[in-house]
Amino acid sequence: GQMLAMAGIGDWITGTLERSGAKVRSVIPEEGGLQFTESFSIGKGSQKADLARKWIQYITSPKGQVKSANMAAYPCLIPSRKGWELLAKETPEEAKRQGMLLNESNVMDMIRNGRIKYRQLPVQQSLEDWNDFWSEYKGA
């Protein structure tokens, strides 16, 4: 079948589909979109905090970021210039697909220009606020 548009759930799914041969693209509307971030943390009282710390240090290094950007099931955007440079050197086709080439229009330009906005940290909304939001969302 064909799909003209669908609600975005992340460029990672587009990357997975594209790599499988699907002719799809992620596009940020001119009106803008939301950017979310994920983080790694070490739980209080962790029995292996030293190993977790080493893993976080690796995955946030340029080499780890390139590995993460090239993952088959969950390719992610790289948050560091050195990571972008290494990705362009090692897998230029993936750097281009993800819009992480420094000498071309890229995702960072969209963030700077306000086209992509960071999702704000959650606040404790009332159940009524959530229900109102959900009703508005469903009716859109």
Task: Give residue ranges: language-model regions.
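Periplasmic-binding protein-like
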Residues: S20-K44
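Conserved C-terminal helix/tail region of periplasmic/extracytoplasmic solute-binding proteins
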Residues: V107-A140
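Sec/Tat-exported extracytoplasmic proteins
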Residues: Q2, G10, L17-E18, K44, ...
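Tryptophan-centered motif/residue detector
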Residues: G8-I9, F36, W130, W134
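A general structural signal for well-ordered alpha-helical packing
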Residues: G10-T14, S39, A52, I56
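Ligand-binding pocket segment of bilobal, Venus flytrap-like solute-binding proteins
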Residues: G1-P29
